[in-house]
Amino acid sequence: MGAAPADAVPGTTRLAPGVTYRQFDITAAKGVTHAHVVVVDLRDTHVRVNLLYPGAVAAREPVSQLADSAGAVAGVNGDFFNITETQHPGVEATGSTDGPAIASGIALKAAVPDGQRFGPALPPGTNTRNVLGVGADRVARLDSLALSGSVRTPDGRLTLGGFNQYALPENSIGAFTTQWGSVSRVRATCGTDTNRAGACSADTYEVTVRNGRVVSASNTPGTGAIAAGTTVLVGREAGAQRLRKLSTGERVQVRHRLVASRSGVPYRFALGGYPVLRNGRPLAGLDNTTSAVRTAVGIANGGHRLLLFATDGAVAYRSGLTIAEVATQMRELGSVDAFSLDGGGSTTLVARAPGASAVTVRNHPSGGAERPVPNGVGVFSTG
């Protein structure tokens, strides 16, 4: 169904040119829940959308802190992430997201294997490479971003299997750059392509490349910040064996990029999650039994309108929505496409009132306080 212009809906607050906020109740299968929505008009040249993140992909901060640090007028939490490592005692959880991420047109990371992801079961036909993004043409889209990369050595070309991600495919090589942060890279060699709780690999190798030459190597993945101009290559199983053939001083060229499956327009912003609504229709097989606090983003008006959606985590409303109900609700709000983001204790929507110096959290996080998260969707206005 269609939706009225955002500023014509009763109870709507104008946050900035092209950005509005409202809240309302939803009667769902498990009870009444309360929703918060920020509507963004991407046709307004005062407005832009970008990734909120703490400056590294393996780091976390509360959404309000991410928004205020970046100067955003509104935002919601983003992708599902590596929140715990109880299945691998002694291995540090990275806090890094499942899916790809692009900020200000720069690719920050690629997606982990489907079997390594954190979060609820994916709907049929979706995967960790799915993204919501906004292109250089200021149009929002649902898409998929796959890694294309290589390591050129004196002996030939090796395929790159990972880029700044907390889990590498079995037998592969991953590249880690300064955007990764300082967290240990050991987790990248744990689990399998089908089971994130699988054992950590016993066959690993790490090579550090600086200014195009191998400068050091180690049998175990390391930790600590990676300097600009430096790439750390981490291999597991067959990937480790290939890296062992490199010698200190040898020339190595590492290349990586994210390739879209649908759009030829470069993305200025993108983050992972999974689609729940496409072309006005809920995806087949969406869960209609498990209700929870939810975060989602809708696309309307030919990709020129974004709807940031979050339900409330207060006790009175915590029954939440099923994923199937999220898809239906986003369609009722006017979305043609919609994308589910991390929910539960991560769900946070912030907005800055006109004239205020900082955002406020508009929903009640279900844990009683904001959960630090690795990324989010930020809305910016120059008006």
Model-derived segments and spans:
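Gly/Ser/Thr/Pro-rich low-complexity, intrinsically disordered segments
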Residues: 1-383
